Amino acid sequence: MKEVNLVLGVIGADVHAIGNKILEYALTNAGFKVHNLGVMVSQEEFVKAALETDAKAVLVSSLYGHGEIDCRGLKEKFIEAGLDDVLLYVGGNLVVGKQDFSEVERKFKAMGFDRVFPPGTMPEEAIKALKEDLGLM
């Protein structure tokens, strides 16, 4: 596989790091070049990293339930930066309270995310989706 740059991070005030490290490990082992921004990442930091690394995809996670607030407007920032062709993935515990995941997925796709993953998604599922969406299969 040719080198494909990805940006990975946990958005907003979220400090949940374990899943982020697991994803970094799995994505690296799958052959991707991962630029992990860690936790408490702002929208602007995601955009800057995508520009600097020529990222083909950005994977945003949120586990503290405020992803809907933290992710609002992110796609617009990518478009403003000329990055409208960069894939945007989001996953985790994205909303407060129990909501039907199909409704959560609909909300995030309406915000411009290409893929939305529920809590408990295995890394292999995201890797498969990336390979499909990037034409690497």
From Swiss-Prot:
Keyword Isomerase found: yes
Stored SUPFAM superfamilies: Cobalamin (vitamin B12)-binding domain
Keywords: Cobalamin, Cobalt, Isomerase, Metal-binding
UniProt keyword Glycosyltransferase present: no
InterPro entries: Acid_CoA_mut_C, Cobalamin-bd, Cobalamin-bd_sf, GlmS
GO annotation terms (biological process): anaerobic glutamate catabolic process; glutamate catabolic process via L-citramalate
The EC number(s) this enzyme carries: 5.4.99.1
GO MF assignments: cobalamin binding; metal ion binding; methylaspartate mutase activity
Top-level taxon of the source organism: Bacteria
Pfam families tied to this protein: B12-binding
Family under the similarity heading: Belongs to the methylaspartate mutase GlmS subunit family.
Record note on quaternary structure: Heterotetramer composed of 2 epsilon subunits (GlmE) and 2 sigma subunits (GlmS). GlmE exists as a homodimer and GlmS as a monomer.
Described purpose of this protein according to its UniProt entry: Catalyzes the carbon skeleton rearrangement of L-glutamate to L-threo-3-methylaspartate ((2S,3S)-3-methylaspartate).
HAMAP family noted in UniProt: Me_Asp_mutase_S (MF_00526)
The protein, known as: Glutamate mutase sigma subunit
Organism: Carboxydothermus hydrogenoformans (strain ATCC BAA-161 / DSM 6008 / Z-2901)
Gene name as annotated: glmS
